[in-house]
Amino acid sequence: GLWSKIKETGKEAAKAAGKAALDKIAEAV
């Protein structure tokens, strides 16, 4: 349904945001 689609999108977005944060941290080190 629509709700599970929203949850999936949120999970993907969170994953992408987490990866971006890790990349930033790696650059700072």
From Swiss-Prot:
Please name the GO terms of the biological process aspect recorded for this protein, alphabetically: defense response
Q: Which residues carry this modification: Valine amide?
A: 29
Q: Which UniProt keywords apply?
A: Amidation, Amphibian defense peptide, Antimicrobial, Secreted
Q: Which domain of life is it from?
A: Eukaryota
An example GO CC term for this entry is: extracellular region
Primary location class: secreted
Pfam families linked to this entry: DD_K
What InterPro entries does the annotation carry? Dermaseptin_dom
Q: Where in the cell is it found?
A: Secreted
> Which function does this protein serve?
Has antimicrobial activity.
Task: Tell me which family the UniProt entry assigns to this protein.
Answer: Belongs to the frog skin active peptide (FSAP) family. Dermaseptin subfamily.
Q: What is this protein called?
A: Dermaseptin-1.2TR
Organism per entry: Phyllomedusa trinitatis
